[in-house]
Amino acid sequence: MNLKKTENALSLTLKNFIKSESFGGIFLFLNAVLAMVVANSFLKEGYFALWHTPFGFQVGDFFIGFSLHNWIDDVLMALFFLMIGLEIKRELLFGELSSFKKASFPVIAALGGMIAPGLIYFFLNANTPSQHGFGIPMATDIAFALGVIMLLGKRVPTALKVFLITLAVADDLGAIVVIALFYTTNLKFAWLLGALGVVLVLAVLNRLNIRSLIPYLLLGVLLWFCVHQSGIHATIAAVVLAFMIPVKIPKDSKNVELLELGKRYAETSSGALLTKEQQEILHSIEEKASALQSPLERLEHFLAPISGYFIMPLFAFANAGVSVDSSINLEVDKVLLGVILGLCLGKPLGIFLITFISEKLKITARPKGISWWHILGAGLLAGIGFTMSMFISNLAFTSEHKDAMEVAKIAILLGSLISGIIGALYLFALDKRAALKK
């Protein structure tokens, strides 16, 4: 398949996804920089105190709410993971993960890109209090990675962009599994049974193809609460909810009605302003077009801008701020080295080696239009862990390991920055080399 055909094969949803994620990545970067500046300025005491401010409401002697930091990490991030879950479901059903032939190469790449960084970190921090942070360098921040690759524009093959997106989606799925398996403590089975009951009700609604999002979202709040109380991180509830959202579109006459409305609009007289009749026709078209979308598409379309331009930038601003002063012990075990080497070395090596071996063994086939040099470049960009890595660091290190958490955040910022710069320069040089050969 040539480049033109590959580009045409990109769905409108995928193109919109690339656009929103890439620009969201730039906004993320600006918020991370702002957080570091504020955390090392005269405003730092207010900055750190802000996130511990309780936010909620009082009912008698009971306070219902969390600190601002917990609202961001547990509640708003649940909405982000809901969107991630919707993306994964869409890709599994209709996208690049919908068949073994399509999914095998990026999924195996994601697997290698998680195992190698995790092993590097674990090897350096084995038998230390910080060994539990092995999941930190395993993650990829899709918004940042896409932000970098989109800045390169046409210098990067479209097929490589598709590969990186699919790899990142598979990586997100892997990160969810890692969180569920390794960062869950003190399970409370009564609450888990309650969560299971909610999931069964959601499954019945899905089976009945209930298209209104309201019952799913209301039950989703209940599911979030049960999972939160069970000891499993509440973001897992959001992913489960995403898989319960219906994806079927209605089989009725609305598409025919849309055509008729379009003809009616074309037959009306045009002027400087829309007539009342034209406004009514356009309103009807909007309603019927929305009804043709599946609940999954409607929810994903609603969440994408909120996630990209509010939740993730706010998360970055709340979590990227680290006060770099003499009180920080950069020699806490080998956290700094483990995270940086995991992201900058483990990611590209893991992705390149496992895909190279799997193709030689005829397990997978490399997508047409991209070379092994391109795969290595994608591996470098996959080393941009940033927000997902920071999210896992918050789970891996509690307040008892504050030094390790702060060092991990510095390492994530440095490792992600190094990976992004080297990856961008590498792909730029690769394009220049190809141009000279022509």
Question: What are these model-derived regions, one by one?
Answer:
Residues N2-L10, L14-S20, T53, N206, ...:
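Predominantly late transmembrane helices and immediately cytosolic-facing juxtamembrane segments
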Residues L12-K15, M83-S98, L146-P157, L200-R211, ...:
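C-terminal ends of transmembrane helices
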Residues F27-N40, F80-L86, A116-G118, V198-A203, ...:
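Hydrophobic core segments of alpha-helical transmembrane domains in multi-pass membrane transport
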Residues V38-L50, F66-H69, M83-S98, A116-G135:
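Transmembrane alpha-helix boundary signature
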Residues D61, G65-F66, N70-F94, I306-S326, ...:
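Hydrophobic transmembrane alpha-helices of secondary-active transporters
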Residues H69-F81, P129-A143, T184-G197, T235, ...:
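Structural signature of hydrophobic alpha-helical transmembrane segments
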Residues L92-G118, K188-G197, V324-G346, W372, ...:
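Entry/N-cap segments of selected transmembrane alpha helices
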Residues I149-L261:
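Functional cores that coordinate and move charged inorganic groups
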